[in-house]
Amino acid sequence: MAEFVRAEVLGTKFEYTTRYVNPQPIGMGSFGLVCSAFDQITQQPVALKKIMKPFDSSSLAKRTYREIRLLKYLRHENLICMRDIFISPLEDIYIATELLGTDLGRLLSIKPLDSKFSQYFIYQILRGLKYIHSANVIHRDLKPTNILINENCDLKICDFGLARLQEPQMTGYVATRYYRAQEIMLTWQRYGVQVDVWSAGCILAEMLRRKPLFPGKDHVHQFHLITNILGNPPDAVIEKITSKNTVNFVKSLPSREPRDLSTVVPKDTDFDAIDLLKKMLVIDPDTRISAQDALRYPYLAPYHDPTDEPVASGPFDWSFDSADFPKETWKIMIYSEVLDYLNVDNPADPAPFDPSTPFDPSALEREFSEFLSDSGQI
């Protein structure tokens, strides 16, 4: 049986196995605390995420079960990888993942990104989304703080707690407002993987213009900002709105023509970047570009390699997600998943980019390491 050490971190009890030493807080959210630590077995730094009180309610337990299942299934070099999981004596759940030095939100708050970094980062985001979407999974909460980056320019998408199956009926309130697709705000009952492409488009725009594109103060203000730039929703979009009040609101808006997106980014922005942005920020999700097709766009040509942009082995098994079990049942299922993970030989982390491919990232890595050093991030 594993031995545990108890520490006090930011006023919170942090229990971890003796495999890990020197926990240091790096993040705190509504669902848990994240600390950096050193893994004495792998001799590598890790991020230890504490999921607090996962068995307090059936909804929390189900969310935790979903996240564990997704982390076990989704394995791709642009997604965060689970390296260990354990349940503490106080019955909190701890998940160890690789530790990356910073996140995109922190970088963007410090200094502007060079255009070549923006280009490489959106490529990796779309590469990860192609894989996620091929597994029939929608991330639903893509934002700069969920994009982790290390000094080698490696990018990984994290936080799958809100991820969902693409299905006919979907709940509406997800994603941080700035990056939320308009079909979610318009209370559609059905939306799909295109919401992640919209979020990625908002992130690309923010990297290019050095500030958020749609910094809405509330739901209504957010929608006004979108229509001020992209114009009024077409009839095909309005017809899919299920709320009469929302339909009346949309129809009451003054007529607005879409602006050229070249007017909302710096004048020296690459034409191909603007062209891709136009395809990602299409109001009608049925005509919005997919992650897979976006990877083929000229803007990403320096990195695009169809032989090195993998898809999932098959769709993720969502059969549990419609279940309405009591928290005790979810607890048993979580314990089973943890034991299953610990009792099998888990595959190694996904391999880094193959240096034999046409793109050699070494020069970009050196420049980005200097960028991080100048920014005080390493």
From Swiss-Prot:
Annotated positions of the Phosphotyrosine modification: 173
Positions that bind ATP: 26-34, 49
Activity regulation text: Activated by tyrosine and threonine phosphorylation.
Residue positions of the active site: 141
Chain ranges passing through the membrane: none
A Pfam family annotated for this UniProt entry: Pkinase
UniProtKB keywords: ATP-binding, Cytoplasm, Kinase, Nucleotide-binding, Nucleus, Phosphoprotein, Serine/threonine-protein kinase, Transferase, Virulence
UniProt note: phenotype after gene disruption: Germinates poorly on and is unable to utilize polyalcohol sugars as sole carbon sources. Increases sentitivity of hypha but also conidia to osmotic stress, oxidative stress and cell wall damaging agents. The double mpkC and sakA deletion completely abolishes mpkA phosphorylation. Affects the cell surface and the extracellular matrix during biofilm formation and reduced the adherence.
Motif TXY, residue numbers: 171-173
Domain of life: Eukaryota
Subcellular location: Cytoplasm; Nucleus
Presence of keyword ATP-binding: yes
GO CC field: cytoplasm; nucleus
EC number: 2.7.11.24
Names of required cofactors: Mg(2+)
Post-translational modification Phosphothreonine, affected residues: 171
UniProt-recorded Gene Ontology molecular function terms: ATP binding; MAP kinase activity; protein serine kinase activity; protein serine/threonine kinase activity
EC class of the enzyme, as a word: transferase
Post-translational modification, as annotated: Dually phosphorylated on Thr-171 and Tyr-173, which activates the enzyme.
Domain notes: The TXY motif contains the threonine and tyrosine residues whose phosphorylation activates the MAP kinases.
Its biological purpose: Mitogen-activated protein kinase; part of an osmotic and general signal pathways involved in regulation of the response to the cell wall damage, oxidative stress, drug resistance, and establishment of infection. Required for growth on media where sorbitol or mannitol is the sole carbon source. With sakA, plays a redundant or cooperative role in the conidial stress resistance. Also plays a supportive role in osmotic stress adaptation when sakA is deficient. Involved in paradoxical growth, the cell wall integrity (CWI) pathway and biofilm formation.
Family under the similarity heading: Belongs to the protein kinase superfamily. Ser/Thr protein kinase family. MAP kinase subfamily. HOG1 sub-subfamily.
Subunit structure: Interacts with sakA upon osmotic and cell wall stresses.
Protein name as it appears in the record: Mitogen-activated protein kinase mpkC
